[in-house]
Amino acid sequence: ELVTKRLPKFTGCDGLSDMQILTPMRKGTLGVQNLNTVLQETLNPAAFDKREVHFRQIVFREGDKVMQIKNNYKLEYLKKDGTSGKGVFNGETGQVAAVNQEEKKVTVCYDDDRWVDYPYIQLDEIELAYAVTVHKSQGSEFETVFIPMSWFPPALATRNLIYTAVTRGKKNVVIVGRGDYFNAM
């Protein structure tokens, strides 16, 4: 409810494009893997008119927010103006525009209007991006950053990590959780 109703009402942000959840971990209740699964079902639930593909333990569904997770200098893209080129890079985010089960490909529209087709065998180059690690967010900015605060392993619970997360937000930063964890850093 916080992500889908209260925060968008308070900040005026769109849950998919304007907001980013940042967390220090990949695993656990507040890790990227779990948060992405929960947020996908909340923000982009399965529907009759949304095609999807299951790849390993991930479901990619039309409308999902995704991120390129490694540089690919050979991946071709096409822009709306008809220009084309090559290269999609680690950390770039976009949205699944189409899942073509006949041609076995997923089309992603990146934030700069580049359209990229991923054959199913290349789906390991993208992952869901409703939540990303603080580390993966370095160098990026978002209108609103949402940071869940809980117990994290001491190696991750550092002021530098929180500083990095907080400085990713351009307009709003929302930290949710217990204050004693935050104060202990």
Map each language-model feature to its residues.
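Conserved helicase motor core of P-loop NTPases
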Residues: 1-87, 97
